[in-house]
Amino acid sequence: MSANRLYLYDSTLRDGQQTQGVDFTVGDKIAIAHELDAIGIDYVEGGWPGANPTDDAFFAAAPALRRARLSAFGMTRRPGRRPEEDAGLMRILDSGAPVVCMVGKTWDFHVEIALRSTLAENLEMIADSIAFARGRVAEVMFDAEHFFDGYKANPDFALRCIEAALNAGARWAVLCDTNGGSLPHEVEAITREVAARFPGERLGIHCHDDTGNAVANSLAAVRSGIRQVQGTLNGLGERCGNANLVSLLPTLMLKMGYETGLSREDLRQLTHVSRVVDERLNRAHDRHAPYVGENAFAHKGGLHVSAVEKDARSYEHVHPEDVGNTRKILVSDQAGRSNVLSLLREVGLVIEANDPRVDRLVRLVKEREFIGYTYDGAEASFELLARQELEQLTPPFELVSYRVTDERRMTETGVPFTLAEATMKVRVDGEMHMTVAEGNGPVNALDRALRKALLTAYPALVDMHLVDYKVRILGSGAGTDALIRVMIESTDGSGRRWTTVGVSSNVIEASWQALSDAVAYKLHA
């Protein structure tokens, strides 16, 4: 084994499921396991057999993995029982997984208070369970629960637990910062002492993020000689989460030069994998996530953009393509000519740098942002505005008028509900269309009325739908007198997403602006 080789253990499907609001289906777990396998993760922890029906169903229909090894998680035997008499231990050994990861106590406080056992029996539980498992599965790991707290309290006992596991045949002994309270300098010092006594190529690290240091603690452990790193995709996990493998992977490979099971080509799938997990969970992707966030390589200030255009290294620590991400130039009231020119080129608008229309467009953007518009994140509205100013846009339709009414009604059983109705007149290719549509709210009614008017002329609208709608009150206006900004995110059958913006003191008018821009962008693109 190369001294520079690290082994990656993903526990998204078990630890990640302990995140508040996360509830994987069996299909979710199988799909995510295949994504992890495809990029070259060494171990995929599928769950805890016997803990819940989902995990049982997952192992019963375990996916065939090409590159990763499937691991089942569980506990060492209970006090006072032999391994073969412990139903929980037998469930993980009978799960069919080639690897099992057993958690056991290494903090004397936990042994005496939580287990109501003795330190001597705890050592026997670790050794008995691992030795028994070694005869039944290909590989056994030991998760040393609360190791860092245990080491601080009683280093001799904590180390004897690691020794018992390794001597019994564990391939890896994983040092766990279970409470997430250790700091990087503590982790580095303690793991260096452990690695001086036991081979680093048999030691792992498992960190929680309760102090915001899970990634830093994992890196500190690697610097001290540990060679297995555990974590989860997007930092999922109970309480504050686990070490984020999505941040760790590129740091270990691109910054620290370690070898992993991933090739550089595999690493280019990282952004995709991160977003697949959020899509599966119906969660918004963290725009500010290191490496893979939408804003990880976003540039807003004009001086920054000008420098990036000359050499991306001036404001980017790695190439976005190396992790499957893309550079993003933002337009805002801080933007200069560099931002605008870069964005115009990106959308295929060719214009000379000294063209006076560029200055006019910059001024227009700043004026509109002053009254509440934002094109930082609403690039579709910016492109429409730019094409209009450059006289390169023919509006696909013209609004003549709209009227929206909201009516509160009662069901036959006396339950109140509201129904919105929109009446709209639009002109398409010189021909007037008047439509009426109902919706569960005014924006939904407007959307339906507009589609109804346009579908005959523009059948491509059939696969477009809105996926997000945000309202924000702007400025110092008092309550209902304030300006309102609406952002709408849309998508279509191709998977493209785009965001548009509208601003008004009337929420329906602001919504109309964002909605009409969304439709116009779809028809133009």
What are these regions (language model features)?
Residues 5-6, 12, 250, 256-431, ...:
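A mid-to-C-terminal "edge-of-domain" accessory segment
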Residues 175-178, 230-238, 253-263, 322-330, ...:
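Short beta-alpha connecting loops at secondary-structure transitions
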Residues 69-74:
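A glycine-rich helix N-cap at a beta->alpha junction
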Residues 457-492:
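Generic long, charged, amphipathic alpha-helical segments
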Residues 179-182, 189-310, 314:
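Catalytic alpha/beta core domains of metabolic enzymes, predominantly
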Residues 6-8, 14-44, 57-65, 78-201, ...:
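Alpha/beta enzyme core
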Residues 440-461:
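A short, contiguous, amphipathic alpha-helix enriched in charged residues
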Residues 495-525:
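Mixed-charge, glycine-accented linear interaction segment located at domain edges/termini
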